[in-house]
Amino acid sequence: MKSNSQIKGVSRGFTLIELIVGIVVLSLSFSLLITLILPLSEKSAEQLHQVRASELGQSMMNEILARAFDENSDMAGGLVRCSEGTTDCTSPDENDFPHLGPDDSETRQTFNDVDDYHGYDSDNTDDENALNEKFSSLYPGFRVQVSVCYSEFDGVCNTTSVELAKLIIITVTTPQDFDFVFSFYKANF
């Protein structure tokens, strides 16, 4: 007759069925874990892109608001507004000159009034900031588009006459192709 210690010594290890059940349980737990974590990582990137788009939109808004209302405005103290007296504001008509948009050889670094940003698209240029850092390296995959038009504070662009305010619309597109739209007014004062 064999002792208990001899019987225990013979029955060491796992059976084939126990190994298969262990592999199945492990694979099910990994698949469940991946199913739960993978969507969270995508959401994490989406939230990061939302924050970066907000930063970029706010930065462009601050840059544009720091400019004069119009090319024909008094840029030395703002005592005389365009459309008062003998100075007309820039025409909203694309066929007139000067019209909304950058002047002949202006670049983003030399924009001096709000409507110079009309038609700006970061895909068409690789601008640098004041620290000589390229836009494409600071915000890879992002795109900024700017539209400027005259408006009566109603959110509607007026393309036929000069108004007391310009509506600026900034659209920031993230690498995941989500558009974030920022709109604000610059008044003629």
Residue ranges and their predicted role:
Residues 2-4, 34, 41, 47, ...:
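Short amphipathic alpha-helical leader/targeting segments
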Residues 54-55, 61-189:
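Low-complexity, Gly/Pro-rich coil/beta segments used as flexible assembly/activation regions
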Residues 1-14:
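N-terminal leader/signal peptides at the extreme start of proteins
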Residues 6, 46, 137-139:
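A general, composition-driven signal for non-globular sequence regions
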Residues 14-58:
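Aliphatic-rich helix starts adjacent to a transmembrane/signal segment
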